[in-house]
Amino acid sequence: MRVWYRVRDLDAARVFYTEVLGFAESFVDEDERWAALDRGATEIAIGEGEPEPEEEGLVATIDVEDVKAERERLDKAQVQVGTVLELHGAMRLVDVFDPDGNRIQLAQELP
């Protein structure tokens, strides 16, 4: 499954997703102004248009080794990040927001 996000500036969003969040571009359509990206098992697509960020609904989730460390790194990079949540001692989650307010979630399975 691939989650689609609308972004105001495709070029700026491509930089954010590749350089800040570590995605790799798998496809770019300059004419239609969209790109497909992946990071491990997580696949997203970003397309130029008016963003429609949602608080609920589908969200791309990226598995990371250490949610707290990633949150600190992103916060230092002035990326909007939420509070780290721990679910039943089994998982840590944190919401990250791209420059257009689209929500991405980082997840860490706990031992």
Task: Report each predicted region and the residues it spans.
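Amphipathic alpha-helical segments
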Residues: 11-24
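Vicinal oxygen chelate
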Residues: 71, 75-111
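Helix N-cap motif at beta-to-alpha junctions
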Residues: 9-10, 65-67
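Short secondary-structure junctions
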Residues: 22-28, 80-84
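Residue-level marker for the onset of beta-strands and adjacent loop->beta junctions
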Residues: 1, 32-33, 58, 70, ...
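Short amphipathic alpha-helices within nucleic acid-binding modules
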Residues: 16, 68-73
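Conserved short beta-strand elements that form part of the metal-binding/catalytic scaffold
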Residues: 24-58, 103-109
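N-terminal beta-strand motif that seeds the catalytic metal site of vicinal oxygen chelate
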Residues: 1-12, 41, 58-60, 110-111
